């Protein structure tokens, strides 16, 4: 099965804000026989948190610092393409930057969603983005055109 990693902003958001676009992407991709892999999977308990911390949460092995880093790195390694949603970011995302760097080193195609004026505008983001788009719909259309024959 073809897998798409759904990376994007988590820190500073509520669980719902971090997860809702991913659920939408998973539904659309599944209609095409593509698996959307969310870093938020099996983390529904985070819905009890007010705001998600960049330092993770020590309450669970998946959300402590080592758990986040290790599973996200595994997901990037095992997915076929990386879709990185940076829309609406309020600050630069170190985690998203790391995931794009891993993808680049592994020669994984990347689709970055980012609007003009985004705090993540940086040479490294632009150079690791194989495809730069401004909406989730455009990103999903790009995924489809890359992955389906």
Question: PLM features: residue spans?
Answer:
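Conserved catalytic or regulatory cores that recognize and/or transform ribose-phosphate-containing ligands
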Residues: 1-149
